[in-house]
Amino acid sequence: MRCPYCGYEETRVLDSRVDSSGMTVRRRRECVKCKGRFTTYERYEFGPVFVVKKDGKREKFDRAKILNGVMKACEKTNVTLEEIEKLVDDVVNDVQKSGNLEILTLEIGKLVMEKLKKLNGVAYVRFASVYKDFREIDQFLEVVEELKKEK
């Protein structure tokens, strides 16, 4: 593994942990040369899954897009990076376990919302506002009222 700080090719593993899903290994590494420390993640790689967009276009499933959306929704909340990573891993695992070669963006959005609702109400409302393309304040209020009823 190449060091991201100095580019040296020799690093050593300080710590390895498997996440609760058993699908990801987190490794803490240290560069032998500059002593810089960094974290790497190892995940299973399944066959390609394609996402069918609202306009009918298809593109390769991209975990990073889900991660970016969830991170934006969780900004300035008490949700940790580990919780975000786990949520995204769970969504990816659900998509891969389905065995489908294609999935609609709407289905991915539903999976994310289902998991965000359990994790953090504010992040859920933020994500819902983009996913459902809110145009009026009443749409926000409806989602907030729905959350209140469930608690």
From Swiss-Prot:
A zinc finger (unnamed) spans 3-34. Its cofactor is Zn(2+). InterPro entries: ATP-cone_dom, NrdR-like_N, RNR_NrdR-like. Keywords: ATP-binding, DNA-binding, Metal-binding, Nucleotide-binding, Repressor, Transcription, Transcription regulation, Zinc, Zinc-finger. One of its GO terms (biological process) is negative regulation of DNA-templated transcription. Binds 1 zinc ion. Residues 49-139 form the ATP-cone domain. It comes from the Bacteria. One of its GO terms (molecular function) is ATP binding. It holds the Pfam family Zn_ribbon_NrdR. Belongs to the NrdR family. Negatively regulates transcription of bacterial ribonucleotide reductase nrd genes and operons by binding to NrdR-boxes. This is Transcriptional repressor NrdR. The gene is nrdR.
